[in-house]
Swiss-Prot record:
<keyword id="KW-1003">Cell membrane</keyword>
<feature type="transmembrane region" description="Helical">
    <location>
        <begin position="355"/>
        <end position="375"/>
    </location>
</feature>
<feature type="transmembrane region" description="Helical">
    <location>
        <begin position="121"/>
        <end position="141"/>
    </location>
</feature>
<feature type="transmembrane region" description="Helical">
    <location>
        <begin position="331"/>
        <end position="351"/>
    </location>
</feature>
<feature type="transmembrane region" description="Helical">
    <location>
        <begin position="398"/>
        <end position="418"/>
    </location>
</feature>
<feature type="transmembrane region" description="Helical">
    <location>
        <begin position="154"/>
        <end position="174"/>
    </location>
</feature>
<feature type="transmembrane region" description="Helical">
    <location>
        <begin position="238"/>
        <end position="258"/>
    </location>
</feature>
<keyword id="KW-0812">Transmembrane</keyword>
<dbReference type="GO" id="GO:0006865">
    <property type="term" value="P:amino acid transport"/>
</dbReference>
<feature type="transmembrane region" description="Helical">
    <location>
        <begin position="190"/>
        <end position="210"/>
    </location>
</feature>
<feature type="transmembrane region" description="Helical">
    <location>
        <begin position="38"/>
        <end position="58"/>
    </location>
</feature>
<dbReference type="InterPro" id="IPR004840">
    <property type="entry name" value="Amino_acid_permease_CS"/>
</dbReference>
<keyword id="KW-1133">Transmembrane helix</keyword>
<keyword id="KW-0472">Membrane</keyword>
<dbReference type="GO" id="GO:0055085">
    <property type="term" value="P:transmembrane transport"/>
</dbReference>
<feature type="transmembrane region" description="Helical">
    <location>
        <begin position="17"/>
        <end position="37"/>
    </location>
</feature>
<keyword id="KW-0813">Transport</keyword>
Length: 462
């Protein structure tokens, strides 16, 4: 075992597909109705508004990655351009978010497998999926990329087919005796803003959560071939991804079905495919949901392992986390993530259910921390680089105004979470988690260790 470099094993097709579908989770296929119930058809506007600010976040990250493509991505930028504690908080927040995502996705695999094998204990397919994905991540970054490529492909094809089917139903009457449904469902059941301003405002916190994980592509920077061009192309296309895969799918759902009947329909995807005569729709979507869950877990193992590696490199976690295997994989970081997932899955079946409600809730706010850090560190990055950025081909539009505007929007979403009884617990538990991370920074003397590690690095460079 040697402390080598991470291998650049992710090609352009891997990066593009991770960017296109890597963060589309189970929620879009199965849980979109609950979000729509808050606000009605105006959820379309909520997705569009959130999508614009996500675009700014990604462009800020892209501008920095073009100059400094590193595995630590936003954690490294926070460390360099804000304060070492900012990098520490960001890395642990991202690690925690992806551990929780991975746990929930593994549990989802077990639950959805019961569609075909109702008597099979749910933990068995979950553990099998985790072992397969764990092995793929340990073998090489390319094997992670191959799994994610095909998982994303399945999700993307399903969404595109669903949008095509929906357009056929809306404008040509497919599955409806030739009678086009039209667009009336967008306003005929209580109006476009059926949930009122408060419903729309509260829905923003649920919609913004649907975009969490979109920054995953930044973590691939240290292992991408030709990172400048592949990441630039992937990030530049994000606005089209948002329009097609999020807004396009939601448009079909709220146009084909009255929004106030969605909760009784089950999955809108199943209903749409069934409507045009695909009798096996439930089984097909169940398979897609399992692949979406495995994709989320796969991304979680990759991302959380790289965050532990970054913490090790920065002197903010045990040194062994920065050890690299012969295959160019952060071995101990990945193994630690797999152990954490396994423990979490076991505890899910033996611990009181309420404990995991709090654990899952705690991941929402930490999941937003990387966005704040990207925006703030980008301001410091601009100041540090100065005139060197004049010829940068990939600059964030209207910075730093858009930085401050996006930060204000994210803070407004957090305020909305506080005033909503259903999301307040997420904010409270998330703040407690972040407070514990800050306390650990001082209790364990992370600042001194970081400075000592920086001094050693500077001496080695001389």
């Amino acid at each position: 075992m040697a402390n080598k470099e991470l291998k650049r094993g992710l090609g352009a097709r891997h990066i593009q597909m991770i960017a296109l579908g890597g963060t589309i989770g189970v929620g879009l296929f199965m849980g979109s109705a609950s979000t729509i119930s808050w606000t009605g058809p105006s959820v379309l506007l909520a997705y569009a508004i959130c999508g614009i600010f996500i675009f700014f976040i990604m462009r800020a990250m892209g501008e920095m990655l073009y100059v400094e493509p590193s595995t630590g991505s936003f954690a490294t930028f926070g460390h360099q351009y804000i304060h070492p504690m900012a990098g520490y908080i960001t890395a642990w927040s991202n690690w925690f978010q992806w551990i929780i995502v991975g746990m929930s996705e593994i549990i989802a695999v077990g639950s959805y497998t019961k569609y075909w094998f109702p008597d099979l204990p749910a933990w068995i397919p979950g553990i099998v999926a985790m072992v397969i994905l764990g092995a793929a991540n340990l073998i090489s970054v390319k094997s992670f990329g191959e799994f994610e490529f095909w998982f994303a492909m399945i999700k993307i094809v399903t969404i595109i087919l669903m949008i095509i089917a929906g357009i056929g139903i809306i404008f040509f009457g497919f599955g409806n005796g030739g009678d086009a449904i039209g667009l009336s469902n967008l306003w005929s059941h209580g109006g476009f803003f059926a949930g009122g301003f408060s419903g729309f405002f509260f829905a923003l916190s649920l919609v913004i959560a649907a975009y969490q994980g979109v920054e995953l592509i930044g973590i691939t920077a240290g292992e991408a071939k030709d990172p400048q061009n592949t990441l630039r192309n992937a990030i530049q296309s994000i606005i089209w991804r948002i329009l097609i895969f999020y807004i396009g799918a939601i448009f079909v759902i709220v146009t084909v079905y009255p929004w106030d009947e969605l909760n009784s329909l089950g999955s809108p995807f199943v209903s749409t495919f069934s409507k045009i005569g695909i009798t096996a729709a439930a089984g097909i979507i169940n398979f897609v949901v399992i692949t979406a869950a495995m994709s989320g877990c796969n991304s979680g193992i990759f991302s959380a392992g790289r965050m532990l590696y970054t913490l090790g490199v920065n002197g903010q976690a045990p040194k062994f986390f920065k050890k690299i295997s012969r295959n160019g994989v952060p071995l101990y970081g990945t193994i630690a993530v797999l152990i954490g997932l396994a423990v979490g899955v076991v505890l899910n079946y033996i611990a009181p259910p309420k404990i995991f409600v709090y654990v899952y809730s705690a991941s929402v706010l930490p999941g937003m921390i990387p966005w704040f850090i990207i925006l703030i560190s980008h301001i410091g990055f601009r100041k540090a680089k100065g005139a060197a950025l004049d010829k940068h081909p990939f600059k964030m539009p209207f910075a730093p105004f858009t930085n401050y505007l996006t930060i204000a929007f994210l803070l407004m979403v957090l305020v909305g979470m506080w005033f909503n009884d259903d999301t307040r617990i997420s904010l409270i538990v998330g703040v407690i988690f972040l407070a514990l991370v800050v306390i650990s920074y001082y209790v364990f003397g992370i600042g001194k260790r970081t400075q000592a590690n920086l001094t050693k690095s500077e001496q080695a460079a001389e």
